């Protein structure tokens, strides 16, 4: 994609550039980790230069959707390249541009979860593309232990904050999904990055955010009992000030 094409007002120009990129990525040519980094550096610049909310939203969705158009043997490398560049560039994103990059990260989290939803088979081997995507998440935005401090906190916070939202968006919290053994196992694997962060992160804020995310009422087992709400209301009424009695 040529510099500036993502910022042109006409959508057809952006679409042609993205189609050309998709064709390139789908070719038989093998790409190296350096190729993916160069590619995502260019895509980062395109988003950086993209003005106005609607084009930004469209571009963020289009860039993330490239993942689903790739041959399976290129998905993990492409996904890793995105997170490596975001880790490298995050702290130079100014406040005026941050919102569109938060959206871009949200779209990439969602598409990564789609890959896991459709491809994770329970075999925790990196050759499995769903497992490979989850390992990228654990090694970069949700990293704990050695190297954790090199991951920008803002990026980490955002990923934790949106994780359950995007799980819900891609349908991984539907009752007919989590009601199966496969669905339960898949969800447990997808929640593992948060569990690791809650337990082992060196950053207290990260630990607390992960704890809050894992306590989300949308997750199985966290549903709030309607009777508990009633009991809380009654307790508050008892504790509340009832006015001055005559």
Task: Give names to the regions the model predicted.
Residues 224-246:
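Acidic, serine/threonine-rich intrinsically disordered low-complexity regions
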Residues 1-5, 10-15, 21, 26-224:
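Eukaryotic alpha-helical solenoid repeat scaffolds
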């Amino acid at each position: 994609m040529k510099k500036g094409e993502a910022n042109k007002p006409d959508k057809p120009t952006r679409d042609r550039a993205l189609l050309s990129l998709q064709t390139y990525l789908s070719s038989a040519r093998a790409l190296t980790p350096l190729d993916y980094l160069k590619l995502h550096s260019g895509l980062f610049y395109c988003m950086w230069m993209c003005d106005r909310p609607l084009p930004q939203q469209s571009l963020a969705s289009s860039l993330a959707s490239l993942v689903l158009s790739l041959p399976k043997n290129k998905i993990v490398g492409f996904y890793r390249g995105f997170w490596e560049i975001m880790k490298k560039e995050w702290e130079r994103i100014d406040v005026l541009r941050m919102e569109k990059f938060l959206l871009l990260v949200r779209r990439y989290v969602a598409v990564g979860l789609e890959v896991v939803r459709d491809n994770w088979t329970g075999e925790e081997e990196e050759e499995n593309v769903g497992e490979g995507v989850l390992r990228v998440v654990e090694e970069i935005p949700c990293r704990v232990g050695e190297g954790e401090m090199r991951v920008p906190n803002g990026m980490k916070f955002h990923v934790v904050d949106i994780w359950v939202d995007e799980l819900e968006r891609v349908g991984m919290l539907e009752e007919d999904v989590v009601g199966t053994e496969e669905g339960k196992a898949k969800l447990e694997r997808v929640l593992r990055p948060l569990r690791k962060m809650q337990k082992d992160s060196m950053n207290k804020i990260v630990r607390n955010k992960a704890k809050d995310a894992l306590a989300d009422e949308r997750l199985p087992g966290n549903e709030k009992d309607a009777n508990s709400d009633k009991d809380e209301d009654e307790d508050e009424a008892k504790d509340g000030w009832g006015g001055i009695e005559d």
